[in-house]
Amino acid sequence: YRKGASVIRMLHSVLGEEVFKKGIRTYMQTYKYNNACTQDLWNSLKSVSCVDVATLMDCWVNNVGFPIIKVSLTTRIGGDPVLVVSQERFSAAHKCNDGLLWRVPISVCVQAIRQEDGAVTQVTLPTVILAERSLELSLPSGLKFSLKPSERCFVKMNPGFVSYYRTEYSRELSLCLEKGIADQS
């Protein structure tokens, strides 16, 4: 039941408050005196949004468990920082790479330094769906990201904890986030 509630919360976040409520009202009105199945709920939510809800949710309903999202920072040619985000099935007992994939809504909060004035600023990147094994996310232009803890830069995956996954940060990103938490940034 915990996974179900968490997955519905995640879907609510993807669709937004008003669209989610409208979809639920549509579902309840359509099936108020009838039997319904999961696909009926997905269809009702899709009818009021531009999201293919069935495709998004199928892996969450049919896959056992949930993913671990691994994140690291690399630099492109030219010096632009890029977040590399990858997924695999989470297993507390052992390394598990069985090929399962989820469609994971990825949201990221980045604290970095504005190049124009050197001020520390926080930016939340637009949510993207990680549907493959991995993807690269460019940081916004005009920001300098440093792995030196003294620079007060960090990456926070899943702000608000609305998506259902665990996060494993690279050693460098973990140290930066720890420093940000200690400084209460």
Protein language model annotation of sequence segments:
Residues 3-10, 18-22, 29-185:
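Non-catalytic accessory/interaction domains
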